[in-house]
Amino acid sequence: MASNLFTIFQLAGFVAIVFIVNLHSVSAESKEASASQGPGKSFKVEFCETNCTENNGVWSGCTGDCICVSVGDSKEGRCMDLGDKVIDTPVAQG
């Protein structure tokens, strides 16, 4: 009987320690800045008024600061403005 009681106390102590460690790790993570809160990591994207098309590997239809964005193998896309120049290289299509 004494050994069963001792085993129960050991299990209860183990559960308490695991709970405290888990609670501490969750609390420590919440104090760090998330990736979305970091400076310079977000930008504003707006749709332009025009659509764009692909003909013989060349995309056309976007004007101004807009770039063409398509989905998959589609030959049609939407023109988007990324606000400040965030992308220095062309966006890969499809």
Swiss-Prot record:
Organism: Ixodes ricinus
Protein name, as recorded: Evasin P1104
UniProt main location, coarse: secreted
GO cellular component: extracellular region
Compartments reported by the entry: Secreted
Signal peptide residue numbers: 1-28
Keywords, sorted A to Z: Disulfide bond, Glycoprotein, Secreted, Signal
Functional note: Salivary chemokine-binding protein which binds to host chemokines CXCL1, CXCL2, CXCL3, CXCL5, CXCL6, CXCL12 and CXCL13.
Keyword Cytoplasm included in the entry's annotation: no
MF annotations from Gene Ontology: C-X-C chemokine binding
Glycosylation sites: 51
Cysteine pairs bridged by disulfides in the record: 48-66, 52-68, 62-79
